[in-house]
C-alpha cells in the first residue's frame, strides 16, 4: 500500500493520470481514465504506446497524440470482460510487446475493469490461477477487481486456459468459441 501511495504522488508530479502504475515494468500498466491531453502526453513520455479504454461512459480525450494508439474494448462498470474482450486484449499485448511497446489499460477509476483485465493477463501469460493473479496484482494495485462477476470471469478464463503453458498456442485454440474467425 505504501508503494502505491508513493507512486501516486510521483505520478502527480509527472502529470500522469491518477492511479497509474506499472504491473510489468515498461510493458503493462493500469490507470484511471486520462482526462486531459496532458495526461495522454504524460503516458507517452512514460513509454506507453497503446492505451486500452474499457469505459464507454468515460472515454479518454479524443485529441490525437503522436505515439499513442487508443483501442476501445467497452465493458460496463462493475461488469467483466467477455472471452472476446480478453482475446482482443491478449492479441494487442502480444503484438505490442513483440515490437517492444508498452500497453496501459484504463476504466473510469482504474480498479475493477482495469484490474480484471490485468489479472487476466497474468492468468494468460504466467499461468496463474484466478485467485493468485488477483492476489499478485493487489500487491501493486490494492483495489483491483471489484465485483463477483469480475472474479467469476477470471475463474472461467483460468478454466479455459488450464494449467498448460499457452504462450505459443494460438488464441483460437485457447478460447474455442472464437476459433472460426481467428484461426482461418
Question: Residues of each region from the PLM?
Answer:
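Conserved G/P- and acidic residue-centered "switch" motifs that form tight phosphate/ATP-binding loops
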Residues: 110
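Cys-dependent protein tyrosine phosphatase-like superfamily
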Residues: 1-103, 117-184
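Ser/Thr-glycine-rich phosphate-binding loops at phosphate-binding pockets of nucleotides
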Residues: 114
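Short cysteine clusters
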Residues: 107
Amino acid at each position: 500500500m505504501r508503494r502505491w501511495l508513493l507512486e501516486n504522488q510521483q505520478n502527480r508530479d509527472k502529470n500522469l493520470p491518477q492511479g497509474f502504475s506499472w504491473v510489468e515494468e515498461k510493458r503493462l500498466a493500469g490507470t484511471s481514465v486520462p482526462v486531459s491531453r496532458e495526461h495522454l502526453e504524460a503516458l507517452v513520455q512514460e513509454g506507453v504506446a497503446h492505451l486500452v479504454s474499457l469505459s464507454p461512459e468515460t472515454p479518454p480525450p479524443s485529441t490525437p497524440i503522436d505515439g499513442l494508439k487508443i483501442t476501445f474494448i467497452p465493458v460496463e462498470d462493475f461488469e467483466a470482460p467477455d472471452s472476446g474482450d480478453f482475446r482482443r486484449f491478449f492479441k494487442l499485448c502480444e503484438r505490442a510487446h513483440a515490437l517492444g511497446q508498452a500497453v496501459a489499460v484504463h476504466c473510469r477509476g482504474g480498479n475493477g475493469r482495469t484490474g480484471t483485465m490485468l489479472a487476466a493477463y497474468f492468468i494468460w501469460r504466467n499461468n496463474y490461477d484466478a485467485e493468485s493473479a488477483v492476489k499478485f496484482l493487489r500487491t501493486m494495485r490494492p483495489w483491483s477487481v471489484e465485483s463477483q462477476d469480475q472474479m467469476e470471469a477470471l475463474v472461467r478464463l483460468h478454466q479455459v486456459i488450464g494449467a498448460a503453458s499457452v504462450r505459443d498456442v494460438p488464441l483460437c485454440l485457447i478460447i474455442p468459441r472464437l476459433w472460426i474467425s481467428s484461426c482461418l
